[in-house]
A protein has these predicted regions:
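Carboxylate- and glycine-rich phosphate/diphosphate-binding segment that chelates Mg2+/Mn2+
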Residues: 1-74
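Glycine-rich flexible loops
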Residues: 13, 19, 24, 37, ...
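Amphipathic alpha-helical interaction segments
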Residues: 30-34, 38, 59-62, 81-84, ...
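Short acidic alpha-helix initiation/capping motifs at coil-to-helix transition points
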Residues: 34, 77, 158-165, 183-186
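Short, amphipathic C-terminal "tail helix"
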Residues: 176-190
């Protein structure tokens, strides 16, 4: 079950990051959005029922492939960068590390704080909030305005993580807060 949940949330993170990344294109968008939807529709059953639901497992494999094709061309974001460090330093499965970071990274990315970081024409203005809202719309997540849709998307992701046994904090995975803080500078420099 742990492998199913960790790899399933990793698939979702691949797809969401590929969709909102500045190198996303019309070609990668369809793959990413379909993969996100497939994860929401199939991961809980693949997790709960395992081999007893081969269709859900097949759909998760397909979602993984589509998300992979999306991020191979659109690339990934800071969540994956940080998850690699967090997982390596604190011996957490990669998908779990992504799961622990994704909604906080999304909240940061959707804010006005990220500044223009490149010469890509797609990034003349930050657009991540709008892209996250498009994800919410595609998943049928409602809200009175874009900010509420975004918050509801975050809540849906948190609910999905809970359904598949992902704990809420790094500390719940046995990482001591003092040790985490002591290794933070070294993690960022690597």
């Amino acid at each position: 079950k742990g492998l199913t949940s960790a790899s399933g949330i990793d698939v979702m993170t691949h797809a969401i990051e590929a969709y909102v990344y500045i190198m996303a294109t019309d070609y990668t968008d369809g793959l990413a959005m379909k993969a996100v939807k497939m994860v929401f529709e199939n991961l809980p059953s693949a997790y709960e029922n395992g081999a007893n639901d081969p269709k859900a497992r097949e759909e998760m494999a397909n979602a993984s492939c589509m998300a992979g094709m999306a991020f191979a061309n659109a690339f990934l974001g800071v969540c994956h960068s940080m998850a690699h460090k967090l997982g390596a330093y604190h011996h957490l499965p990669h998908g779990v590390a992504n799961a622990l970071l994704i909604t906080e990274v999304m909240r940061f990315n959707a804010s006005d704080r990220p500044a223009k970081m490149g010469t890509f024409p797609q990034y003349e203005y930050p657009h991540t909030l709008e892209r996250y809202v498009e994800c919410a719309d595609f998943l049928g997540i409602k809200g009175r305005n874009n900010q509420e849709k975004f918050e509801n998307l975050l809540a849906a992701i948190e609910e999905l993580k809970a359904k598949v046994g992902i704990k809420k904090t790094i500390q719940e995975y046995g990482v001591d807060e003092k040790y985490f803080l002591d290794t933070l500078d070294e993690m960022v420099e690597q």
